[in-house]
């Protein structure tokens, strides 16, 4: 296994780990399925009484890393690579009692008004968990959350205007891409930050 990132804040630490399937002692290489397959897992330690560990438990303190099932062992099919690839974390923002994970999933930003009506842009998934006393998770409620979860899009009024209120959309953020502003090409992306009982989503250059 290889630790690929460490994020810390409040009383918690999160680690992302890549593990490659190898043959165990006594196993024949020819008999091992998925040899060389990489699995990306996310682990957490620290305080969990308000759900910040993200493992579905309300543990007071976790001294050794515990796996976060909702953020581990995820795969998706990549059309370009024509293969299943692991979904890794792009980043984890850690606040005083809550956290948000931006996934490094496949994104698509080429849909336009001239493309078909079924052509849709989609960005990076974001999951939220932990303390929610001040509505910082964006769920519209104040209950703490022990499992990472998706939230609805921020502009629900616009969703209703186009007749989509019955559909289950979720909040995405735009990955880094190039746009033209005032005649100049600028690289922009949306980012998530968690602080002390507050969350911010903003566009950065």
Describe each region flagged by the PLM.
Residues 1-10, 15-77, 84-94, 101-205:
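Periodic beta-strand elements of RCC1/NHL beta-propellers and select beta-solenoids
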